Amino acid sequence: TQRIRHKYSIKNVTGLNILPFVLYDDVFDIIAHCLVGSEGTLGFLSEATLETSHLYTHTASAMLYFKDISEACRCVVALKKSAPVFSCELLDRKSLESVNDTTGEGLTALLIDTKSDSEEGLEGNIKAIMDVVGQFELFNDAHFSTDPEETAGWWSLRSGIFPSVGGTRPLGSTAIIEDIA
């Protein structure tokens, strides 16, 4: 119980909330509070239908560094309009500092992922993305990788950012994260 209370006081949590197991004794209260989502919705699951995502056979990722966040954001807008980007994560200066990224000081990065069912399709996706990215000033050369170890390292870095940034905030404060389109 103390460990759960302590962890919740120092870390903002996304995903399943287990704090109700500590705060409430009544089973109904525990279940009701476990079903409260990040937007404050309460729900009851009586049935679920899962739709799986297509698993592409070819993927590539790139970690693109920009000198400032404004240029990175302009690039995101341009990519959204015309490039086959499967996912894109913006990592600001504080995020990169929190995971000890040593690429450069004060940078912003975009972690971009593209996918296809063929090698030719993937190459076409990368070319289309690079055509857009080429319109912007990067800190270093753009490099797409299909190497699973290299790309896993980038995505692992990204996964570690939220706990790292959350750990730098003052005790008792809340880190707010939201996905935007």
Functional labels for PLM-detected ranges:
Residues T1-A181:
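Noncatalytic alpha-helical scaffold of FAD-dependent oxidoreductases
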